[in-house]
Amino acid sequence: MSKSLRKTHPLLKMANNALVDLPAPSNISAWWNFGSLLGLCLIIQILTGLFLAMHYTADIETAFNSVNHIYRDVNNGWFLRICHANGASFFFACLFIHVGRGVYYNSYLYIPTWMIGVIILFMVMATGFLGYVLPWGQMSFWGATVITNLLSAVPYLGTDLVQWIWGGFAVDNATLTRFFTFHFILPFIVLALTMIHLLFLHQTGSNNPLGLNSNVDKIPFHPYFVYKDIVGFIIFMWILIGFIWKFNYLLMDPENFIPANPLVTPVHIQPEWYFLFAYAILRSIPNKLGGVIALVLSIAILMILPFTHTSKFRGLQFYPLNQILFWNMVIVASLLTWIGARPVEDPYVLTGQILTVLYFSYFIINPLMSKYWDKLLN
């Protein structure tokens, strides 16, 4: 009997092994849906971004007006732009949930997969920042000025590095052109890294809610999880499109609807909501270099998790004290997001500093707590 084409054709065989005959644990919950949702988000962002790039001009004289032109004159351009802007917010929401699930269920023990995942997170954050600059509104210009200026904290090379990135002595036309170039290319690099992420994941197989070896109880990805993912896609698209039609500007900054003016500084400079937790950590450190290091560490610290793992069981579901600590961490991250949007004045400065200490202390207390719980069980 001849084998099916999907099992013999070189290209189809790869797709088959990843999406059809992939052995998957039978008990993975809805928290495992966010990986496929991130794939959907990336496709939405690349497609909407591609059509927006056809009408956008990366020039400081016309960038703001070209976005206006997309809204007013391009057929369904308003939908493309709002879908792209809100799609980014949904992308980051799914990313944070995906990372949170990895931390909760100790998925970071698949070290290569986890490391590539953290690199993807950095890349997506870079892409998001570059995209925020492109409409060339007030917050775009001043956000770019403030964030790129952080590189001046690098000892010895700082000033040259900033001017090299700007392409001059201030954020100007050269800056906008190169930011657009990198914003266009980075999603494709993220797509390539996603393939590597999946490649490493399929070497080991997925983790599951029990944290046990599930080789004795695996089922094919299709039809079971394909349909489960499709249900997730439908719910996600329903929420995203509802959000686009009803709350289209809720997550955008009103300042960014004013054309960029280098002579007028906004009252409060802030990035998009998905960077606010890291921005709050940056502002909490009085020293410039220390703030930049803390900013990078707020994400990079995820890379130390596999090496600080001390628990005998896999996942926080077996550690009640660690569960309390984890959800406390979620609240701390949410409060940091809120603090990042507040002005730099008391009591917000002190609150931000306390929350920053609590944020980083999680990564120290969590392994100690799980070790203590294991000792209690003995």
Curated annotation (Swiss-Prot):
- PROSITE patterns attached to this UniProt entry: CYTB_CTER, CYTB_NTER
GO CC terms, sorted:
mitochondrial inner membrane; respiratory chain complex III
Cofactor requirement: heme b
Spans traversing the lipid bilayer:
34-54, 78-99, 114-134, 179-199, 227-247, 289-309, 321-341, 348-368
Topology relative to the membrane: Multi-pass membrane protein
Q: Which residues bind heme b b566?
A: H98, H197
Question: Which SUPFAM superfamilies does the entry link to?
Answer: a domain/subunit of cytochrome bc1 complex (Ubiquinol-cytochrome c reductase), Transmembrane di-heme cytochromes
Residues the record lists as binding a ubiquinone: H202
CDD domains in alphabetical order = cytochrome_b_C (cd00290), Cytochrome_b_N (cd00284)
Gene Ontology MF annotations: metal ion binding; ubiquinol-cytochrome-c reductase activity
What keywords sit in the KW lines?
Electron transport, Heme, Iron, Membrane, Metal-binding, Mitochondrion, Mitochondrion inner membrane, Respiratory chain, Transmembrane, Transmembrane helix, Transport, Ubiquinone
Q: Which Pfam families match?
A: Cytochrom_B_C, Cytochrome_B
The UniProt annotation places heme b b562 binding at: H84, H183
Give the co-factor note.
Answer: Binds 2 heme b groups non-covalently.
Places the protein is found? Mitochondrion inner membrane
What is an annotated GO biological process for this record, any one? mitochondrial electron transport, ubiquinol to cytochrome c
Gene3D superfamilies per the record? Cytochrome Bc1 Complex, Chain C
Q: What's its job? A: Component of the ubiquinol-cytochrome c reductase complex (complex III or cytochrome b-c1 complex) that is part of the mitochondrial respiratory chain. The b-c1 complex mediates electron transfer from ubiquinol to cytochrome c. Contributes to the generation of a proton gradient across the mitochondrial membrane that is then used for ATP synthesis.
Which protein family is named in the record?
Belongs to the cytochrome b family.
Entry's PANTHER family?
Answer: CYTOCHROME B
Q: How does the record describe its quaternary structure?
A: The main subunits of complex b-c1 are: cytochrome b, cytochrome c1 and the Rieske protein.
Q: Extra info from the record?
A: Heme 1 (or BL or b562) is low-potential and absorbs at about 562 nm, and heme 2 (or BH or b566) is high-potential and absorbs at about 566 nm.
Q: What is this protein called?
A: Cytochrome b
The organism is: Aedes aegypti (Yellowfever mosquito)
**Upper lineage ranks?**
Eukaryota, Metazoa, Ecdysozoa, Arthropoda, Hexapoda
Name the encoding gene, please: mt:Cyt-b
